[in-house]
Amino acid sequence: MSKRHSPAPADDRPSVVQLVPDEARLYNLLMEPGETSLSPEQLREHFRRSGILADDPRAAGIYDYLDKARQRNETSLSVTEFAVVFAMNPSLFMRIAEDSMVVPAWSDFARSVGKIFNERRSSNGGKVAAYIPELARVPADRYGLSMCSVDGQRAHYGDAQEMFSIQSISKTISYCIALEEAGNERLHERIGREPSGHSFNAITLDPRRRPHNPMINAGAIVSCSLIRPGDSASARFSHVFDTWKKLAANGAVSFNNTVFLSERDSADRNFALAYFLRENGAFSKETNVAATLDFYFQCCSIEMNCDSMAVVAATLANGGVNPLTNERVFSSGTVKHCLSLMHSCGMYDFSGEFAFLIGVPAKSGVGGGIMVVVPEKLGFCVWSPPLDENGNSVRGIEFCKGLTSMYSFHNFDIVTGHDGSERIDPTRRNVSLDNARHVDLCWAAMHGDIKEMQRLVASGVNLNGADYDGRTALHIAASEGKLESVRYILQNGGQFDRVDRWGNSAVQDAERGEHHAIVALFEAFASGGRKTRLSA
């Protein structure tokens, strides 16, 4: 199985650690009631219950440290030792301790989803895809599920680590890559945006002689033709493969050459479709049809497991930013277009029914996988090879129905309000949790953690929110002398003239602390610098 992180150094225990109040407060918060110390196993359990797994790159050093503590037979962590671990990812610790992830009660949610998954295991019917000989060899009893939140909380069930052929799920990412490289106008001159009303491999075009959409074979072949058309075959595929690796946070992604050869040898329909496309001017004049088809078959022959595919889905749910690496892979506009097409066209001839019943973007493949995206919340991948008459996983569809019967994930659940149903929003927040997120923002400002501030603001935290004393994140950053925090807040709409309940502004806090560079920054902003980027 692919490792998402490298091991930490052999000894990561510094001899001196500077303690700050946060460590002591969180140490006490994480201790079990009645205990006088925090054990390495208790800390590991806090991470596990929050959905932060051992192969999460954000927690790599933390788990390595706890493993070494286990090997040393340590039964407790001192506050000083805890500070070492805390310093590896302070913002992650804060959010785990205060249960402020997007799904607050993750362990309860994961247990409930596991029950839905197991109840659908007995769903019978369907047949494993036989028109690609290599796929026909996959055992019909395989069944796996993984989920990943936009905060990187993860859980796996069944055969979630077993590799499967992604097939048509590849169309989503090929479309995203082509869209970013060719641009919206150029790409959609050649590919439409409408459901076709025909089967996924139908030899048909829209009235403008284009494939109806990028989620059917014709559209995906044209998408592939627009990806780095001037590069060599190996360079083009490496580019797509590397993009999948980024989306999966360097998780399990591979290429199955046997599936590729099997698919190419049984691809008469796709060859006919490609030459039909060329006859109707769907390709540029320079396009090599045979090479484009090989490229398309290669993309379909990528293999992943549910674990990695769920991270891909969560990256799309997170607007193109990978929740495990914080790397932006696609622009938010690209993701918006992709999710729109997944919602209307992603499930073959069942797309309309899926949109009506389930109500979230999804893409299936004849390998038995379904990638499901709940925007701003979660990504799922469910895999089971037996397919229904539409080419969708039988157990996968049943799982999705069970999921949305329990949870309010349908895109339009928001308009029903309190309609008497007992469906649950697992991300629902209360006032105390919103207050905790404001505390997170102030903490990040105090420590100069710009990435954490960006994440919190992107998730909806008010940059100008104040505590009961009227103090904002800008007050805190100015008091602590955090120049870059102040700069970020001012550049993003921070109100520099807000006063706390004692009548103090942030600039007065900076003056009192003799933080002269920050005072100068405030002066530049007040005298017209708000129109500039306030660069250092």
Label for each model-derived stretch:
Residues 152, 165-185, 312, 380:
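Active-site SXXK
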Residues 10-17, 43, 318-447:
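Structured C-terminal helix/loop/strand segments within mature extracytoplasmic catalytic/sensor domains
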Residues 452, 484-485, 517-518:
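Conserved ankyrin/ankyrin-like repeat signature
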Residues 96-118, 123-125, 178-299, 307-310:
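Active-site-adjacent helix/loop patches that line small-molecule binding or acyl-intermediate pockets
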